[in-house]
Amino acid sequence: MAVAFGSVGIHVGVTVGLDPGRDKVGWAFVGEGRELLVSGIFPAGERALFWLGLRALPGDADALAPWTLEAPLPRGEASSRMAFVTAFVVGDGTCGGELASSLEAQDFGCPILRVDERGTTLEARTLYWRLHGPSWWQRLLPRTLWVPPRPLDDLAAWAIAMRGMAGPVD
């Protein structure tokens, strides 16, 4: 599989989005159709363990299990597709440069793209409700009052990956 960067972004394979932060890092494996394969959050202090987990794929399908929050696809399908990582997209916010440098040092053999992550937390809220749907009583409230019951860093990473796949905005 090949990866091409051009006027329309990243093509072919699986893209890993990373939403860096001081305390935790959201991650998401995203297919070529922008579908979420699997996502989660790991503590920033466990970055080295997360890199080891990435290297263990696809042989060890449970390598990322300790940090996994969303896995909408059947386990076998997701783990087989996760082996074909062709690019990483890192948000340029808090600690983004540090995470990108650490990722480069790992030498995964994939390009690393930095994108503007402004607004991805709000996008993550929308993605959460698309995956889970609000309860009947939440539907009675305005959408702005729908608050997801968990941190959304992994879904922000999904939004970051999709931005990288969309290509540069002129």
Give the residues covered by each predicted segment.
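Phosphate- and other anionic-substrate recognition elements at nucleic-acid/protein interfaces
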Residues: A2-D170
